[in-house]
Amino acid sequence: NVAIYELVQNSESLIVMVDGDCTISADSLVALLEGAKLNTDAYLLAAIPEPIGRYSESITRNTLNGKALSGNFYAITPLFYEKIKQTGFMLPVGLIGDDSLLAWVAQCDFKLSNGVKNGLMVGIKGALFGYHRLVPNTFKNIKMYWRRLQRYSLRHIQQNCIKAYLTLENDDFASLPSHVVELYRYHRPEHIRTDNRLNTFLDTRTSKQIKTISV
């Protein structure tokens, strides 16, 4: 919100978002710039994480197919910037996973009823970034990993609340309330994952926590 509505002054700018713990090269930035020139109708340009671990191939494939956005390193195009300003869309305060919602908004062109549109989020093959992979092999890392799983659970619940709001109230993403807490009234038991015991435990715990939060 701050970047879009306060910091960016030139509407023709390509807005590059980078996490502080990422490593990128000049070639990656050039690739994003070239990608912007070649994909003038795109909203988001997605970079690709350097191959680490067993999920790298899947992430790369989904990114290049316009189905995934890594929040570590990506670019908001001038077209998306202008559309955000025109619609007045803002990320709700307290949201976990800003990049996930931005990708959702871009793919659906600001309305859930539009469905996913191809070409609005584009993976850029030459835009690579390095990152630190958290491995739970020490007590400190285990604690950090556990906190990360809790955040993933909250993100999952929040995204389901957003979808419920858009389905029941107003399918325009720009109509989302200013604070994510206002969306918790749309939380339902079926939002709790049942694919494995750990996710069920985490989501049940998260569900109980948000029920104690008042708007």
For each of these PLM feature ranges, what is it?
Residues V2-L14:
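Active-site nucleotide-sugar/metal-binding loop of Leloir-type enzymes
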Residues S11-T23:
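Short beta-strand-to-loop acidic/aromatic patch adjacent to the donor-nucleotide binding site
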Residues T23, L45-I59:
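Short beta-strand-to-loop element that shapes/binds the nucleotide-sugar donor at the catalytic cleft/hinge
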Residues D27-L44:
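Conserved donor-nucleotide/metal-binding helix-loop-beta segment in metal-dependent transferases, i.e.
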Residues L69-G88, D99, W104, C108:
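Conserved nucleotide-sugar donor-binding
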Residues V93-N118:
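A short, conserved alpha-helix in the catalytic core of glycosyltransferases
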Residues V116-R148:
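Active-site donor/metal-binding and catalytic loop motifs
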Residues V135-V215:
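Terminal low-complexity segments of carbohydrate-biosynthetic enzymes
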